Amino acid sequence: MATFIFLLALIKAQNTPGDYLALHNRARAEVSVGPMQWSNTVAVYAQAYEEKRKGDCAMIHSTGPYGENITAGYYPEFFRADAVKLWANEKPLYDHAYNKCVGGKCGHYTQMVWRSSVRLGCARMPCKANSQFVVCNYDPPSNYIGEKPYDSWVV
């Protein structure tokens, strides 16, 4: 019984807003970008968007007032940290000198480390086939084509 309670506490501990925030801020610190703060307002927006996707869990961006990363995990448990790690793992695909993504696949990472986005709100919901749908929104919006996410002198 004690093992079950410990595992339940561990699962719960890996599914808090702080998990989203800590991993975002770690990725930002690696390139000398200041930390983000959790925003309940932005988190409410993320939750409302998830509710719209509840029926299909389609990987479609909200086109709302914030920057956005979305993903889904197909595990019995897909923790908040897992989603953020997927995005952070795109870092090697970003060439800061040329401001290019290898294969065009680093936009989640650049959204995470964008210097002007300072507020974060995220949400997660279960979907079909044991998947989890995760959305994080960034305020103010960013990730503009042709602009670098952070200054070159910081790397």
Regions found by a protein language model. Give the residues of each.
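Cleavable N-terminal signal peptides of Sec/SRP-targeted secreted and luminal proteins
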Residues: M1-A13
